[in-house]
C-alpha cells in the first residue's frame, strides 16, 4: 500500500505541512516527511480504516479525536488556544485484496478556520480608547474528524489591536484560528478601556454572534470576517 496526500483543498496562504501521520489498521507512522509513503509491511485481505493527519502545534490527536490545547498565556487557563497550527485530516475506508498493489490518493481536509472580528467604535470618546480585550464562547475544543462532529464548547481569549491605516483605520481588529463552533450560542464579550486621565470608566459590551457564525464549521479554507 502506498499513500499520497492531496493538500490542494486549503486556504490561500496556508502552507503545506512538512510532516504527516498515517494509520492503517494497526500500522502507524507518527511522523513522515515526503510526498508519498509506501507501507513497510504487507496487509491481509480485508477492510481497513485509513487515517491521515498532520501533527500540529497546539493540537493533540487520539484516534480520530483532535483536541485544542489550553492557552499558554499566563492566567488564561480557562481559555483554549486561539492560535493552533494549521491542521488537516483524512479518513477513508479501503478494501484490500490478495496479491494486489494499491496507491491511494487521500484528499486532506482543512480543519482550522480563521475568524477575524472587527469592532468599530463611534462617538466623541472613540479616540480615547486605550485597549479592547474580550472573549468568544461556544467555540469547539474538540472534533471527531471521522464524523465531522464538533464538541467540548470552550472559550477563546481575544486581544484587539487598533487599525492605523487604510479604509478601516480607527477600527479595532482581532484574528483567531478555530476548529469550529460547538454550541447553539456564540457570545462575544468585550471590555473597552480608556486612556488614563480621561475619567471614563471601562465599558463592557456583549454581542450574540450565533447567527453570523452558524455556518462556521463549513468551508473552512475560506476565512470569515
Annotate each predicted stretch with a short phrase.
Residues 5, 80-81, 88-96, 108, ...:
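Hydrophobic side chains in beta-strands
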Residues 42, 94, 105-111:
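Extracellular and analogous surface-interaction loops
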Residues 1-7, 107-122:
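A short, Gly/Thr-enriched small/hydrophobic beta-strand-prone motif that recurs across taxa
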Residues 57-103, 197-225:
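Structured interaction patches on ligand/partner-binding surfaces of diverse proteins
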Residues 35-37, 98-100, 111:
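Ser/Thr- and Asn-enriched, surface-exposed coil loops between beta-strands
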Residues 12-64, 128-218:
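Tryptophan-paired
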Residues 102, 122-123:
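Compact mixed alphabeta submodule
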Amino acid at each position: 500500500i502506498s499513500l499520497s496526500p492531496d493538500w490542494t483543498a486549503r486556504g490561500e496562504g496556508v502552507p503545506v505541512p512538512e510532516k504527516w501521520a498515517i494509520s492503517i489498521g494497526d500500522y502507524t507512522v507518527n511522523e513522515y516527511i515526503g510526498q508519498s509513503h509506501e507501507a513497510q509491511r504487507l496487509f491481509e485481505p480485508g477492510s481497513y480504516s485509513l487515517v491521515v493527519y498532520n501533527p500540529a502545534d497546539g493540537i493533540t490527536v487520539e484516534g480520530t479525536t483532535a483536541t485544542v490545547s489550553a492557552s499558554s498565556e499566563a492566567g488564561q487557563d480557562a481559555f483554549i488556544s486561539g492560535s493552533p497550527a494549521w491542521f488537516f485530516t483524512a479518513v477513508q475506508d479501503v478494501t484490500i485484496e490478495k496479491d494486489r498493489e494499491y496507491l491511494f490518493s487521500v484528499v486532506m481536509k482543512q480543519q482550522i478556520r480563521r475568524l477575524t472580528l472587527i469592532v468599530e467604535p463611534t462617538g466623541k470618546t472613540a479616540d480615547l480608547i486605550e485597549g479592547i480585550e474580550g472573549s468568544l464562547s461556544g467555540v469547539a475544543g474538540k472534533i471527531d474528524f471521522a464524523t465531522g462532529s464538533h464538541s467540548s464548547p470552550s472559550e477563546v481569549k481575544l486581544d484587539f489591536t487598533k487599525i492605523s491605516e487604510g479604509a478601516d483605520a480607527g477600527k479595532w481588529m482581532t484574528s483567531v484560528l478555530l476548529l469550529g463552533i460547538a454550541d447553539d450560542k456564540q457570545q462575544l464579550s468585550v471590555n473597552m478601556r480608556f486612556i488614563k486621565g480621561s475619567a471614563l470608566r471601562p465599558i463592557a459590551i456583549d454581542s450574540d454572534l450565533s447567527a453570523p457564525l452558524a455556518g462556521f464549521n463549513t468551508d473552512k479554507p475560506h476565512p470569515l470576517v
